[in-house]
């Protein structure tokens, strides 16, 4: 069910019965079903700052340019380094490099090489294999052996995930948050399970449906 603002308010079917609530600015504030409840909080710039679920808390922190520079997933803190909006590295809470990313020759979303868990005893490059959309399908180690394998639905929901190495980059080589299943797309968050953004398109660039994913 949708309201007059094209906001999804009720999702039923396939044993699902989920209700959605929004604030006056069009931000998703609550997702509720018989199995779970998620509460979404925002700052004065309509940036998502916190998501609380049944058994998790995720906090998002942003820099002056609006990029998410840090994420707290329960008790784990990860910091990010960007260049022109492109993620180049992940740092741990102490500021030590955990991973650095190397870009390929295609558009910025195509990450072709992941280098390293940067500890002296566990330093190894891994390599991304992408499909025609730029989505990560395989991750190979230095010997060419498959470490990770992914399959996605038409709207980007991960339907198969076989992992031996931690990886944030998934559909369209974008960052998926493990606790929430949302994709961080810089200006907004995308929910692949329903094929919609959690916030309105403030630029009004994608037609009348301000939550649609194109």
Language model: regions and residue ranges:
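Beta-strand elements of repeat-based all-beta scaffolds
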Residues: 1-12, 17-21, 26-32, 38-41, ...
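A motif-centric feature for acidic-aromatic and gly/ser/thr-rich catalytic loops and repeats
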Residues: 1-2, 118-186
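Short, small/polar residue-rich loop motifs at catalytic or cofactor-binding pockets
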Residues: 14-16, 33-36, 54-56, 75-76, ...
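Acidic, glycine-enriched catalytic cores built around paired aspartates
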Residues: 195
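Immediate flanking context of iron-sulfur cluster ligation sites
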Residues: 202-205
């Amino acid at each position: 069910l949708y309201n007059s603002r094209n906001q999804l308010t009720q999702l039923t079917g396939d044993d699902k019965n989920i209700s959605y609530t929004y604030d006056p600015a069009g931000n998703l504030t609550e997702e509720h079903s018989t199995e779970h409840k998620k509460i979404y909080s925002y700052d004065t710039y309509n940036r998502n700052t916190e998501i609380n679920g049944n058994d998790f808390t995720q906090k998002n922190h942003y820099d002056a340019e609006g990029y998410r520079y840090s994420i707290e997933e329960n008790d784990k803190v990860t910091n990010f380094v960007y260049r022109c909006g492109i993620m180049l590295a992940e740092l741990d809470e102490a500021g030590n490099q955990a991973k650095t990313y190397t870009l390929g020759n295609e558009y910025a979303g195509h990450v072709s090489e992941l280098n390293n868990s940067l500890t002296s005893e566990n330093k190894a490059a891994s390599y991304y294999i992408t499909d025609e959309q730029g989505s990560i399908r395989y991750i190979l180690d230095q010997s060419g052996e498959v470490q990770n394998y992914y399959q996605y639905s038409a709207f980007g929901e991960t339907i198969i995930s076989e992992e031996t190495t931690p990886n944030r980059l998934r559909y369209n080589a974008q960052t998926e948050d493990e606790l929430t299943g949302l994709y961080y797309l810089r200006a907004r968050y995308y929910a692949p399970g329903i094929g919609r953004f959690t916030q309105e398109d403030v630029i009004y660039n994608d037609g009348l449906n301000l939550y649609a994913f194109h």
